[in-house]
Amino acid sequence: MSDRLTLLRPDDWHIHLRDGAALPHTVADVARTFGRAIIMPNLVPPVRNAEQADAYRQRILAARPAGSRFEPLMVLYLTDRTQPEEIREAKASGFVHAAKLYPAGATTNSDSGVTSIDKILPAIEAMAEVGMPLLIHGEVTRGDVDVFDREKIFIDEHMRRVVELFPTLKVVFEHITTADAVQFVTEASANVGATITAHHLLYNRNHMLVGGIRPHFYCLPILKRNTHQVALLDAATSGNPKFFLGTDSAPHAQHAKEAACGCAGCYTAFAAIELYAEAFEQRNALDKLEGFASINGPRFYGLPANTDRITLVREDWTAPASLPFGELTVIPLRAGETLRWRLLEESK
């Protein structure tokens, strides 16, 4: 087994960079590895139109390390009031690549999200017409639904309907966490894809709850039982082009995670491709990592793959105990623990 792994430079098809003083840190981490990234729009206030997307894009570009060619791919935040014309303007901009459906209350800064899919059907129709992908956080948020069942019920109540109503629409089922989602995406048309995070491949709810509550494993959608983890690993390492890399790296300051009511999100951007390599190596599937990380995503979005390469070496190193996050601190996933793969920084 080789101790070196060279891949076409990957892209991250789902990441949270936050804003303001955090950007120099989060942008440096993502730009270290990835050529492009789909940038989540759930700021306060959210990114609702092309003008706001461009302003956020400029802030990200200004935060890139010197010499970086990292390209942020911007996303609109759908609300009950999103108009078809806003979709058309965003598509015409050339820098907005998708729009995101957050069910209201589903995750961080989603209070302005969609309360009923019926209210955004004209906007979704416009997306289908202009060829803009719809990214969906696939969870119901009703109080009578168990948090571990939110994704499955969303499929039955909403996802099937959207796909049937708009057969030409490209839909990304974001950060899937269940065998049910794997089956749905596998059986759907070629216009339906899904992102999978490193933390959902490496961990299940036992890691978060057994022996004590570990807040830095808490994310939404929440970690599920190990049978779902196995289904995700099967999908990611299958070679099926419908599944591709999306870290959902979502930093929160240490005090906001280690709290009586802690925030949801795992910070993985500092070592994302290294974490995915561990997951794929567990399945003896390192030969499938390039497709998942570097080819399937751009193909789904109709973009060319990157042409430069990165190299990973099998070499133990210790993840930092903490990282700067503006004037605050973020605790990364696997803080203080050993990682098995390391990115060669000088690789081109």
UniProtKB/Swiss-Prot annotation:
Keyword Hydrolase appears in the UniProt entry: yes
Reactions this protein catalyses: (S)-dihydroorotate + H2O = N-carbamoyl-L-aspartate + H(+)
Post-translational modification N6-carboxylysine, affected residues: K100
GO molecular function: dihydroorotase activity; zinc ion binding
Amino acids binding Zn(2+) 1: H14, H16, K100, D248
Chain sites annotated for binding substrate: H16, L17, R18, N42, H137, L220, H252, A264
Cofactor(s) the protein needs: Zn(2+)
GO terms of biological process kind: 'de novo' pyrimidine nucleobase biosynthetic process; 'de novo' UMP biosynthetic process
Subunit structure, interactors included: Homodimer.
Database matches in HAMAP family: PyrC_classII
Protein name: Dihydroorotase
Organism: Pseudomonas fluorescens (strain SBW25)
Classification of source organism: Bacteria, Pseudomonadati, Pseudomonadota, Gammaproteobacteria, Pseudomonadales
